[in-house]
Design a protein with these regions (language model features):
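Short, polar/charged, Gly/Pro-enriched helix-capping and turn/loop motifs at alpha-helix termini
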Residues: 57-58, 144, 210
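A broadly conserved amphipathic alpha-helix scaffold signal in soluble, globular proteins
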Residues: 99, 132-135, 179
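A short beta-strand-to-loop transition that corresponds to the Sensor-1 phosphate-sensing loop
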Residues: 118, 145-150
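Conserved catalytic/switch belt of AAA+ P-loop NTPases
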Residues: 128-145
C-alpha cells in the first residue's frame, strides 16, 4: 500500500502536504530532510502519486491508470533522478535529467515531478545548475530533494524550497508497526525499537535482518560485562 495513511508518524509533514493538495497550493520545490531509512522516499512517492491521481483527492486512489503506473514505477510524469557515480550527483546528471527535460510538458498528468534521493551528493556545480531551474520553474513542475544533510545544500536553494524535517517516530508507533503489520514477536520488536531510535526504516531492516540474533547477543554481552569495561572498550563495542 502507498497512501498517507501508511506513513508511520511524521504527522506534521503529512498534514502540510495534504493541506497543500486540498488548497491546490503546491510549491514548485520541496526538501525532505531526515536520516537515512527514515522514510523520505516513501513520503515523496505518496505525495507524487496523490498529485497525479486521476480522482483528485488528498489520498491516492491506487486504482486509476496513473496510480497503477506510479505503483510500478512507470508513471512517465514522475521522474526519479539517478546518478552513475555512487557518491556524486554531477552537473551532467542535473542537466540531462532535469534542466533539459523540464521544458517538455507533462505527458498525461497535471504535474511533472522530479524526485532526487541523496541530494546532499550534488556537487557545487550541480547545485548551481538546479538553482537556475528553481528560480524560474514551469508552472507544472515539482522538484523534491531528499537529503540526510540539509546543511550541505546552498542557502539559495533552501530559500526557494519548502523544507520539511523528519522527526523520530514514537517508540510505541514503531513497536505497533513491527508487531501488527510485520508480525514481529514482541521480544524482537523491543530490541529493534531500542536500536532504531525512532527510525522506522532501520527498525524494519533490523527486524528482517539475518544479523538480528548477532546484534541481540552482542547487546546482551555488552550489558553483562559493561561494569568491567573501560570507556574505550565500551566505545569500540558500540
Amino acid at each position: 500500500m502507498a497512501t498517507f495513511h501508511d506513513i508511520i508518524g511524521q504527522e506534521q509533514i503529512k498534514e502540510h502536504l495534504q493541506n497543500a493538495i486540498s488548497a491546490k497550493k503546491i510549491s514548485h520545490a520541496y526538501i525532505i530532510n531526515g536520516e537515512k531509512s527514515s522514510g523520505k522516499e516513501f513520503i515523496a512517492r505518496v505525495f507524487a502519486m496523490t498529485l497525479q491521481c486521476e480522482k483528485g483527492g488528498t489520498e491516492p486512489c491506487q486504482e486509476c491508470h496513473s496510480c497503477k503506473q506510479a505503483l510500478s514505477d512507470n508513471q512517465p510524469d514522475i521522474i526519479y533522478v539517478s546518478h552513475e557515480k555512487p557518491n556524486t550527483i554531477s552537473v551532467d546528471d542535473i542537466r540531462a535529467q532535469i534542466n533539459n527535460d523540464i521544458a517538455i510538458k507533462p505527458y498525461s498528468s497535471p504535474y511533472k515531478i522530479y524526485i532526487m534521493n541523496e541530494a546532499e551528493k550534488m556537487t557545487p556545480q550541480a547545485q548551481n545548475a538546479i538553482l537556475k531551474t528553481l528560480e524560474e520553474p514551469p508552472e507544472y513542475a515539482v522538484i523534491m530533494l531528499l537529503t540526510s544533510n540539509v546543511n550541505s545544500l546552498l542557502p539559495t536553494i533552501l530559500s526557494r524550497c519548502v523544507v520539511l524535517n523528519m522527526k523520530p517516530v514514537a517508540d510505541e508507533q514503531v513497536r505497533n508497526y513491527l508487531m501488527h503489520q510485520l508480525q514481529v514477536p514482541d521480544y524482537k520488536a523491543e530490541v529493534c525499537v531500542a536500536f532504531a531510535r525512532g527510525n522506522i526504516g532501520k527498525a524494519k531492516s533490523l527486524a528482517s535482518s539475518e544479523d538480528f540474533d548477532n546484534i541481540k547477543n552482542e547487546a546482551l554481552s555488552l550489558l553483562k560485562y559493561i561494569q568491567d569495561m573501560d570507556l574505550s572498550e565500551i566505545t569500540a563495542a558500540i
